[in-house]
C-alpha cells in the first residue's frame, strides 16, 4: 500500500511511522482516527492527509506486525515444522503485545491482502515442503492460521478458555502434529 504524502505547506509533524507506532499502543478494537490524532497532537483532518480511514490505519498496522513476525530464514523440507513453530510464537508475542490486535484479527473482516498474503504464501510454502499437495497446503494454512489466531484472540479478549485450557505451547504442539492436512483415510 502506498503511503499518502501530505500537501505542501508547513513541515510535516506526522509520518507513517509515527502514526503506526501510536496505533500500536492503542486498543485496536476501539481506537478511532480522532483518538490517534489526539495522541499525536494534531487535528484529525491532518491525520486524514496521511491515512484515509480506520481500515487503512489497521492495514498499516497489519503490515508492520506481519513484518515483525515473519522469520528471516525460509522454511526447508527439513525445517518446516520448527519454522512454523517459530512463526506461531512470533505471532503469539507480537499479536498479544499490541492491545486488541489478536482480538481484531480473530474477528471476521477484510485483512490487508498484501501483508497477510505474504504470511499465507510463506506458510503454504512450508506445508508444500512437508509434502502436502497444493490443495492440502492451502487447507493446512487455513487450519494453522485460524487455530493460532483464534486461540490468541480468545486469550486477548479475556474469554475464559476454561480451567483445563491448554497452554499455548501444548496447543501448538498438538496443532502442528496434525499438520499438514491429509486426505481422510491416508
PLM features per residue range, with description:
Residues 63-69:
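Short, basic, alpha-helical segments at the C-terminal edge of helix-turn-helix-like DNA-binding modules
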Amino acid at each position: 500500500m502506498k503511503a499518502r504524502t501530505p500537501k505542501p505547506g508547513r513541515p510535516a509533524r506526522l509520518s507513517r511511522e509515527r502514526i503506526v507506532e501510536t496505533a500500536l499502543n492503542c486498543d485496536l478494537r476501539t481506537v478511532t482516527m480522532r483518538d490517534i490524532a489526539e495522541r499525536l497532537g494534531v487535528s484529525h483532518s491532518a491525520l486524514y492527509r496521511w491515512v484515509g480511514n480506520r481500515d487503512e490505519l489497521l492495514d498499516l498496522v497489519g503490515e508492520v506486525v506481519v513484518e515483525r513476525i515473519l522469520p528471516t530464514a525460509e522454511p526447508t523440507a527439513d525445517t518446516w515444522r520448527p519454522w512454523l513453530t517459530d512463526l506461531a510464537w512470533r505471532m503469539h508475542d507480537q499479536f498479544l503485545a499490541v492491545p486488541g490486535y489478536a482480538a481484531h484479527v480473530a474477528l471476521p473482516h477484510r485483512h490487508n491482502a498484501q501483508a497477510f498474503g505474504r504470511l499465507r504464501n510463506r506458510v503454504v510454502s512450508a506445508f508444500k515442503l512437508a509434502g502436502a499437495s497444493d490443495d492440502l497446503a492451502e487447507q493446512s494454512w487455513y487450519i494453522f492460521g485460524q487455530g493460532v489466531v483464534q486461540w490468541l484472540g480468545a486469550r486477548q479478549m479475556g474469554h475464559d478458555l476454561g480451567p483445563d485450557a491448554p497452554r499455548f505451547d501444548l496447543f501448538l504442539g498438538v496443532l502442528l502434529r496434525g499438520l499438514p492436512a491429509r486426505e481422510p483415510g491416508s
